[in-house]
Amino acid sequence: MARITVEDCLKVIPNRFNMTLAATVRARQISVGSTPMIDAGRDKPIVIALRELAQKKYNENILNTIR
């Protein structure tokens, strides 16, 4: 598995705080049953969410689901 860095995720969502919130929202979606958009393996939901974000599978618009 490739190592995930904050810098990879910040390329998609430049604001560190919004990036954290977006990954948290996506991880919650995965933990309650949403299908991962990548090969999840045995990773935890937050790791899956960060990998998805680094691969540009979602963006900051996910924050609109909580507002």
From Swiss-Prot:
Entry's EC annotation: 2.7.7.6
UniProt-listed InterPro entries: DNA-dir_RNA_pol_omega, Pol_omega/Rpo6/RPB6, RPB6/omega-like_sf
GO cellular component: DNA-directed RNA polymerase complex
Pfam families: RNA_pol_Rpb6 (PF01192)
GO molecular function: DNA binding; DNA-directed RNA polymerase activity
Catalytic activity: RNA(n) + a ribonucleoside 5'-triphosphate = RNA(n+1) + diphosphate
Keyword set, alphabetical order: DNA-directed RNA polymerase, Nucleotidyltransferase, Transcription, Transferase
SUPFAM superfamilies: RPB6/omega subunit-like
One record GO biological process: DNA-templated transcription
Oligomeric and partner information: The RNAP catalytic core consists of 2 alpha, 1 beta, 1 beta' and 1 omega subunit. When a sigma factor is associated with the core the holoenzyme is formed, which can initiate transcription.
Physiological role: Promotes RNA polymerase assembly. Latches the N- and C-terminal regions of the beta' subunit thereby facilitating its interaction with the beta and alpha subunits.
Family per record: Belongs to the RNA polymerase subunit omega family.
Record HAMAP family: RNApol_bact_RpoZ
Protein name as catalogued: DNA-directed RNA polymerase subunit omega
Protein source organism: Nitrosomonas eutropha (strain DSM 101675 / C91 / Nm57)
